[in-house]
Amino acid sequence: MRGCGVDRTGGYVRLALAAPAVRVADCAYNTQRMIQTVRRAASCGVDILLFPRLSLTGCSCASLFAQDTLLSAVCTHVSALCAGTADCQLLALVSVPCFLRTQVRVCTALVARGRVLALVVQDTLAACGAQKMQVPCEVLYGGAPVPVYDVQTCFESAEGLFSFCVGAMDGSVPATLVLQAYGTPSTAQTPDIFAAHAAAYSAQHQCAYAYVNAGWGESSADAVYGAESGIFECGQCVVQDSLQEMRERGERPAHAVRGLHVSADVDVSLVHFRRRARSGHTTLGASAPCVTLPAGIFAASKAHATLRRPRVPCPFFPPAFQKSQDAVPPLTGAVCLAVSAPSDTQDGFLQRTIDLAAQGVALRLEHMGCRRLVVGVSGGVDSACALLICARALDFLSIARTQLYALTLPGFGTTSGTKGAAQEFARALGCTVQEISISAAVTHHLHDIGHTMQQCDGTYENAQARERTQILLDRANQLDALMIGTGDASEGALGWETFGGDHLSLYAVNASLPKTVVRALISYAGRVPERFVCETDSPYAPRGAAFSRVCAAIVAQPVSPELIPPCDDRIVQCTEEMLGPYELHDFFLYHITVNGFGPRKLFRVAAHAFGXAYSCAQLCAALRVFFTRLFSQQFKRSCVPDGPGLTEVNLSPRVGFYFPSDTSGALWRAELEQLACGE
């Protein structure tokens, strides 16, 4: 198979699944419904349209499949379908019974631009024997010669941007899209079975997998068909639907007569990236011939203005968090998924995250022979998260939480609100709380190097961060303890940390957790205080509601390093005012490291995911900050302490996303400039 061509589509292929209502053995009626569906799909810019198994006749014709009358009608109406859609720029995959080489076989006709490009033999109808057919070959179909292939054949677009196969392939899968038409009787478990198979197959083979089952109108003599359909991408669901889900959305049964239609934009460039990044993945197989289709078939000659994909502004959260806010629409609608899941689903994910991190800390304590931990707490979400994890780690080892030393280290920018929140949070967990001011030591140090206290610059700020780290490390030495770092993945990606200061620790427990996840963890702790509040009779340890209030206060506090003196005890140094929203930077971080997106594609998917929340100018500004700091601050990530990998993003130079510290970012900056100019 040839390599990827020049991508002018943004890397997306618009795929539609359609299960229009059928009448069993009524080819004329079914053909008209299919023509309507094809024309509607073409008007929406669909590139590939997949129909269910034997959709032109209905899959429940049984012994009638062997009748000359039905087979002749199929051939006639395939020609009618071609004629009725000749001006449509898409590829329709239509499953039909064909009499080939003495057998009635289930074939998929590739219909485009008014003709049948090929027939793909799926299998032989059980009632008619099982004699194997030698392919490839050529047959006369509808009065024209048509090549015939088997399911192990891969078809590629003329531009080489994507490829597909009809039905699951054996062994390695060279195709980027696997298209499966079903005619399977439905049970209550069928949607879950189809979805589980699609998720597993697409994850194993790093491909996109789409399926559609027969639906309304099939014979109900012995079974019913639910039109289950779905598109999965490298293990993740892009969209799912069925007649049952239509009913659950409140659509009247009469709506089912018009059939089910689902469409989405499949990110084939993501599939290509995942395969390149996946060590040992084979995309070529000796038993998988590749056929290049003629040019001009697909509508994907330019990028669509609007993406038909789930809106996922927080990609670090698992698929279980994704729940559609609206009914999955017909071809003319828009697919919109948002982070909104049942609380038990969210809580399970968040609790597992905390417990895995705590396991890492517990194992490191055992390895070092330590029984104490030291954490610097500031009243922000990062240090609160680290403290929460450390408390859990001591529980795992049956060590009293009093062996967890929470040090508040107030300096020139510390406010009473953040210091009070830090101390209250630590006491609720049962920690030993200690306060050590850094003001005198930093003042003396700045005087020694000839730096005035009025000059609140980088030296002024970094001196405080390094003093805090020195105190924490020295206190850990005193206590024979492990000093835990609190910096998160968002700060690591942006280099928003002091080299030799908060950049250093003995174990960086938050290193793979972005700010959005850290905030969610503290909010979760506030929702279930009984899981974390220390069981003690101490009058200083707040219970339940008080702990929840302090968690809420910590989450609501603006992110700040608190290194500049406050105004009337209010924070004046807000990180997100300087860098841009962390939710944007976390979004960029995920997609550049996990999916390999560049600036142009990041801009497009961010605009889609966040809707009207940010203007184009705001997105461009945040992208410029992100890429500038990603490259300029790599030297800090080249020497980081150990820390557990808890998400898909890991910035460790040992096992994660890494590039040399002196790498040029000129290519990415140039693409950003083109983006800013509207090119």
Swiss-Prot record:
Keywords on record: ATP-binding, Ligase, NAD, Nucleotide-binding
Start and end residues of each CN hydrolase domain: 13-268
Residues that bind deamido-NAD(+): 364, 462, 477, 491, 496-499, 636, 661
The EC number(s) this enzyme carries: 6.3.5.1
Keyword NAD in annotation: yes
Ligase: annotated segments: 346-679
Keyword Nucleotide-binding: yes
Enzyme class: ligase
Record pathway: Cofactor biosynthesis; NAD(+) biosynthesis; NAD(+) from deamido-NAD(+) (L-Gln route): step 1/1
GO CC terms, sorted: cytoplasm
Binding residues for ATP: 376-383, 486
Family matches, as SUPFAM superfamilies: Adenine nucleotide alpha hydrolases-like (SSF52402), Carbon-nitrogen hydrolase (SSF56317)
Pfam families per UniProt: NAD_synthase
Recorded catalytic activity of this chain's protein: deamido-NAD(+) + L-glutamine + ATP + H2O = L-glutamate + AMP + diphosphate + NAD(+) + H(+)
Cited Gene3D superfamilies: Carbon-nitrogen hydrolase, Glutamine-dependent NAD+ synthetase, C-terminal domain, HUPs
Biological processes, Gene Ontology terms: NAD biosynthetic process
Entries under InterPro entries matching the protein: C-N_Hydrolase, C-N_Hydrolase_sf, Gln-dep_NAD_synthase, NAD+_synth_C, NAD/GMP_synthase, NAD_synthase, Rossmann-like_a/b/a_fold
GO terms, molecular function: ATP binding; glutaminase activity; NAD+ synthase (glutamine-hydrolyzing) activity
Record-linked PANTHER family: NH 3 /GLUTAMINE-DEPENDENT NAD + SYNTHETASE, NH(3)-DEPENDENT NAD(+) SYNTHETASE
Record family assignment: In the C-terminal section; belongs to the NAD synthetase family.
Chain's role: Catalyzes the ATP-dependent amidation of deamido-NAD to form NAD.
Name assigned to this protein: Putative glutamine-dependent NAD(+) synthetase
Source species: Treponema pallidum (strain Nichols)
Gene name of the record: nadE
